[in-house]
UniProtKB/Swiss-Prot annotation:
Region called Disordered, residue ranges: 103-274
Protein's UniProt name: Translation initiation factor IF-2
Compositional bias per record (Pro residues), positions renumbered to this chain: 190-207
Residue segments, region G1: 378-385
Presence of the UniProt keyword Nucleotide-binding in the record: yes
Residues covered by the tr-type G domain: 369-538
Taxon lineage: Bacteria, Pseudomonadati, Pseudomonadota, Gammaproteobacteria, Methylococcales
Assigned keywords, A-Z: Cytoplasm, GTP-binding, Initiation factor, Nucleotide-binding, Protein biosynthesis
Species in which this protein is naturally found: Methylococcus capsulatus (strain ATCC 33009 / NCIMB 11132 / Bath)
A Pfam cross-reference name: IF2_assoc
Subcellular location(s) per record: Cytoplasm
Gene3D superfamilies xref list: P-loop containing nucleotide triphosphate hydrolases, Putative DNA-binding domain, N-terminal subdomain of bacterial translation initiation factor IF2, Translation factors, Translation initiation factor IF- 2, domain 3
Biased amino acid composition, Basic and acidic residues: 103-183, 213-254
One MF annotation (Gene Ontology) recorded for this entry: GTPase activity
């Protein structure tokens, strides 16, 4: 320790300078100036002085030299209480303090203790004993006062009871005398004089016993106490009859102890049987929260009435409804007000707005640069996946069925220029919704156009999606290695869509590339990063994560799996996710290569396990801290979806009713679709439903993500539906049921194969269409009679030819008078099958004999035509 001045020591210790100087003087140090230097020896002397003054003497041995014990003894004092009750026990506590000193230190300690200390301890012990005695006396006096008060109360009750009995006996005597006067014919028995009941002598109070407290005697049972009381009454001179008279009061009548009928002149005193609770007269008015759609039963439950009452109110308003029918918000509010309650229009997103407000507050965290999210769009087979394949140096396209992309693939690529997140969307017409989702979550759209093919329908659609989302475009002219590649043609066609290249004065970068040779790939990546720098992409990192679901599926052994893209914040393992109507805790996270992760930041595409179900593709997800609120929101969203479906079903039923009026009956083709991912299911459902015609309606009655289960097979069996498995297979129990019941099951891995098969099924369900085709006309020249055929017409074939066993029509003056079958066809005397134009023949018409000269016989046949 170095030497310091007094002023410095005061600053180190944290005490005033004057106080430190005073303490130095008390320690015997001749220091008066604040700038004097203190040595280590002087500081130790000051420290020893302070310890002695505060009673802290430095000891070399940590072993205690004395032990102080506080002894507490409890004694019990038994105190008698009122008669009939057990004795009361009082606890008396005596506290003693003893100090034990080591024998080796005893002489020194005894010398150290002064006489004043010993006197103080003796005084404390005496005071404790006096306090204990005073407490015991106080408790005893209080107990005696309670006993005296209890005895006085019992005496007063006994006196009041005796006076009441005397008054009751006097009243009975007066009634008996009145009865004797009214009944003069019968000798009235003389009433016995009342027997006075001596008052019981009060018992002397029990003296408190100073012995050990005994266990309290068990209290008498109520029935035993009642029996003892009756015994006391009988011992006092009351008979059972007197007791009965006492109990019955005015209703007791003489004459064998039987009751007589009450006289009409004297009113009977009946006990009041009115209930104590009275129903409130004012009506109860509830505040009813009315959502956008609610069923009649739920509305009745919120108003605490029966559903029938709500239906009656609706009928008065002119609305016919059932208990399960869905009402809109306006109708429900009118019903609530009609029934006298207060309606409150409930907003659907109250809880969600609260959570979003919290997210908005958290979004004020500092923002850091993030990788760009790039979506690759273009027409089918223009080389989108192959281009991404070359960038990632892997065979992505080989894993897709038919070499086409059927759901969004998300990959993060680390290049020499930085990280880029790529989204590969399908280019088929059936995947329009998936391309629209890809445009919403992206920062830059790379439009891939084949230089040898030019602009195609899905190319125009991709331009519209990017323009609607306000996302900048980078055009990649692919397949430049082909001989017939024409980049100028691509530029001209895109200029027609208002996509102008930079070299022509526009703002869109056009990059010629080849996914096969890799030419222009680095230039394309540079163009993407330049565009990202212009956009200045940033996102907060140190907040809970939020983003969007790209795809979801149901995997065996892993459960619901969601492919998500984080847009802001950091997602950690164990976070609680709210994703559409699904919730769950993140059990595991994986990147696009299957590597497990503990956390992921913005623009990272990851795979998440742990949700309660497979969410819809395009749903937004957020990390919430309040698990209860998240469950409420998920339940509310599910209820809203169910209400929407019910309302749509109700509307569909009404539409079906009106469409059936005046129209032919339609045929339903029911389908049950199971797919590997949510996006493919959505695309299949949309594409197959659009195949409906006026005569055949395609209905998807069930669908989901995952393998075909026994439940799906039972649904298809019950609804006579076709089972379609898209990149999934049926499990063992489902296969057994499908084979036993002969359910129509089809597996597909390319969406267009499924569409073609359903088209064939629709054509097979249509009724065959037939067209009448006139093949010949014969002119009747003469009529003959035949014993075998009846009337036979001699005819000349003027048009076409006539064949045997075909339907015919007989025309007279170009009016059909008969339609039947050609029975016999002869030429001269020979039966022939066919007679050509310009030749004569004999025709016999089955079941018709009114053929005349000049008639025409028209021969026709029905030809089946393909339905359209």
């Amino acid at each position: 320790m170095s030497d310091v001045t007094v002023r410095q020591l005061a600053g180190i210790v944290g005490i005033p300078l004057d106080r430190l100087l005073h303490q130095l003087g008390d320690a015997g140090l001749q220091i008066s100036d604040a700038d004097d230097v203190l040595s280590d020896a002087e500081k130790m002397k000051l420290l020893n002085h302070l310890r002695q003054s505060h009673g802290k003497v430095q000891e070399s041995v940590t072993e205690p030299k004395r032990v102080t014990l506080q002894r507490r003894s409890v004694t019990e004092l038994k105190q008698g209480t009122v008669p009939g009750k057990g004795a009361k026990t009082i606890s008396v506590e005596v506290r003693k303090k003893r100090t034990y000193v080591k024998r080796s230190e005893l002489p020194e300690t005894s010398d150290r203790l002064s006489e004043a200390e010993q006197a103080r301890r003796a005084l404390e012990e005496q005071q404790q004993r006096e306090l204990a005695e005073q407490e015991a006396r106080r408790q005893q006096e209080e107990m005696l006062r309670e006993q005296a008060a209890e005895e006085e109360r019992r005496r007063q009750e006994e006196a009041a009871r005796t006076a009441e009995e005397r008054r009751r006996r006097d009243e009975e005597e007066r009634q008996a005398a009145a009865e004797r006067e009214t009944v003069a014919a019968k000798p009235a028995p003389v009433a016995a004089p009342p027997i006075p009941r001596p008052a019981p002598e009060p018992r002397p109070p029990a003296r408190p016993s100073a012995g050990k407290p005994k266990a309290e005697a068990p209290r008498a049972h109520p029935a035993e106490r009642e029996t003892e009381a009756r015994g006391d009454k009988r011992s006092a001179g009351l008979s059972r009859k007197d007791e009965y008279r006492e109990l019955q009061g005015d209703d007791f009548r003489k004459g064998g102890g039987k009751r007589k009928k009450p006289k009409t002149g004297r009113p009977m005193l009946m006990p009041e049987q009115k209930h104590g609770f009275e129903k409130p007269t004012a009506p109860i008015v509830y505040e009813v929260a009315v959502p956008e759609s609610i069923t009649v039963s739920d509305l009745a439950q919120r108003m605490s009435v029966k559903g029938v009452e709500v239906i009656k109110a609706l009928m008065k308003m002119g609305v016919m409804a059932t208990i399960n029918q869905v009402l809109d918000q306006e109708t429900a509010i009118l019903v609530v007000e009609e029934m006298g309650h207060k309606a409150i229009a409930q907003k659907e997103d109250d809880l969600e707005a609260e959570i979003m407000a919290n997210l908005a507050a958290e979004a004020e965290a500092p923002q850091l640069p993030r990788p760009p999210v790039v979506t690759i769009m273009g027409h089918v087979d223009h080389g989108k996946t192959s281009l991404l394949d070359y960038i990632r140096k892997s065979r992505v396209a080989a894993g897709e069925a038919g070499g086409i992309t059927q759901h969004i693939g998300a990959y993060q690529v680390k290049t020499d220029h930085g990280s880029i997140t790529f989204l590969d969307t399908p280019g088929h017409a059936a995947f329009t919704a998936m391309r629209a989702r890809g445009a919403k979550v992206t920062d830059i759209v790379v439009l891939v156009v084949a230089a040898d093919d030019g602009v195609m329908p899905q190319t125009r659609e991709a331009v519209e999606h990017s323009r609607a989302a306000g996302v900048p475009l980078v055009v990649a002219m692919n397949k430049m290695d082909k001989a017939d590649a024409d980049p100028d043609r691509v530029k001209q066609e895109l200029v027609g869509l208002n996509v102008v290249p930079e070299e022509w004065g526009g703002d869109v970068q056009f990059v010629p590339v080849s996914a096969k040779t890799g030419a222009g790939i680095d230039t394309l990546l540079d163009a993407i990063l330049v565009q990202a720098e212009v956009l200045e992409l940033k996102a907060p990192v140190a907040i809970p994560a939020a983003g969007v679901v790209l795809e979801s599926k149901l995997e065996k052994g892993r459960g619901p799996v969601a492919d998500i893209l984080i847009q802001r914040g950091t997602l950690k393992k164990g976070d609680f996710l709210l994703c559409g109507k699904e919730i769950g805790r993140v059990r595991a996270m994986f990147n696009e290569n299957g590597k497990p992760l503990k956390e992921a930041g913005p623009s990272a595409p990851i795979e998440v396990l742990g949700l309660s179900g497979a969410p819809e593709a395009g749903d937004e997800f957020i990390v919430v801290a309040d698990e209860r609120k998240a469950r409420e929101i998920a339940l509310h969203r599910e209820e809203k979806l169910r209400s929407t479906k019910l309302a749509a079903q109700q509307a569909a039923k009404l539409e079906d009713v009106f469409s059936l009026m005046g129209s032919e009956e339609t045929i339903d083709l029911n389908l049950v679709i199971k797919a590997d991912v949510q996006g493919s299911l959505e695309a299949l459902r949309s594409a197959l439903t659009e195949l409906s015609t006026d005569k055949v309606k395609v209905r998807v009655i069930g669908g989901g993500v995952g393998g075909i289960s026994e439940t799906d097979a039972n649904l298809a069996l019950a609804s006579n539906a076709i089972l379609i498995g898209f990149n999934v297979r049926a499990d063992g129990s489902a296969r057994k049921l499908i084979e036993e019941r002969g359910i129509d099951l089809h597996y597909y891995s390319v969406i267009y194969n499924a569409i073609d098969e359903v088209k064939k099924s629709i054509n097979g369900m249509l009724e065959p269409e037939f067209k009448e085709q006139i093949i010949g006309i014969a002119q009747v020249r003469e009529v003959f009679r035949s014993s075998k055929f009846g009337t036979v017409a001699g005819c000349l074939v003027v048009e076409g030819h006539v064949r045997r066993n075909l339907p015919i029509r007989v025309l007279r003056d170009n009016v059909v008078i008969f339609e039947g079958q050609l029975e016999s066809l002869r030429r001269f005397k020979d039966d022939v099958n066919e007679v050509k134009s310009g030749m004569e023949c004999g025709i016999a018409v089955r079941n018709y004999n009114d053929v005349r000269e000049g008639d025409q016989i028209e021969v026709f046949e029905k030809v089946q035509v393909a339905p359209h």
